[in-house]
Amino acid sequence: MTLRDAEYWAKRFRQLEEAEHDKSSQYIYENVEKQFTLAIKELEKEITAWIQRFAEDNALSMAEARKRLTTKELQEFKWTVEDYIKHGEENHISGEWTKQLRNASDRVHVTRLDSLKIQMQQHLEALYGNQVDMLDKHLQETYADSYYHTAYEVAKGQEVAVQMNRLDNARLASVVSKPWVRDGKTFSDRLWRDKDTLNTVLQEQLSQAVIRGEPLGNITKNVRDRMGVAISSAARLVSTESAFFATAAQQKCFSFLGVKEYEFVATLDDRTSEICQDMDGKHFKLTDMKPGTNAPPMHCNCRSCIAPYFDDAKDSARAARNLETSKTETVPADMTYPEWKQKYVEKASTGPK
């Protein structure tokens, strides 16, 4: 067994963090920026159609906006709402929103402005419902990838392998559903809260724009600007939650492997925060690990990570036996991650929760 120095471990685990960071960046581009951009286009289309239908000279007065829908318009509106309800039931959108839609469908009188607000909120409910589902899947994948890649890097570094327990779907779902911030809110709670805030702001802006008689261009620009803020907020959430669960997976893996201490490893460049610069190179007991205090994420968009810390050869030699054969197994220098996973994970049983 080779005894690696701290620089080796820091380099390897910094590379792991960079790989996870790249995955999160790609996720943000594919599932946040693109999805929000599509939602912006849909909102602009709804607003444009509404203005063109009821306005004169490309602007609508509050008096006109507060007029009730005609019998024909009301029927069309109810058909639209029924479609929303069906979509919500098929895609597990908030039950509270479905209840509001049913109430709207039963109303005898609906104003023009209310009809647009309901259409706008429907797009937000669908958007954020998808965000919750996609982020849940992403965080589960992040946790599993970090857990297995951590075990692989330790095995390669020590040149010995341990048979790993497989992480089943139920365990992964349970892990990412638990709150880790002091306020007790999960990523799902934060997304739905952000949706409520965004919906309130957009509807207030719409009402104020109508009161002022603003033209269509101003209204749609306000929507784009506010949605841009929402994109940034969602991206920060993805980045921070991903960093936490990647680190949590490493902590769990270190504990399983018998690693007693870890080193704080910062990505040192001109974007590194002062707090991460100060923490870089410090090592702590694994049992004392607290994200935000002595482990990543220390802040939003944190790019720091942890690496195993071995004080001597005795520490480095811990937990290097195959769980099935109780024998130490050597990891070939050229063993790839897929080969390692096939041998030491895929053939293993599902471990205890």
Protein language model regions, located:
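Structured, charged N-terminal subsegments at the starts of enzyme catalytic cores
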Residues: 101-224
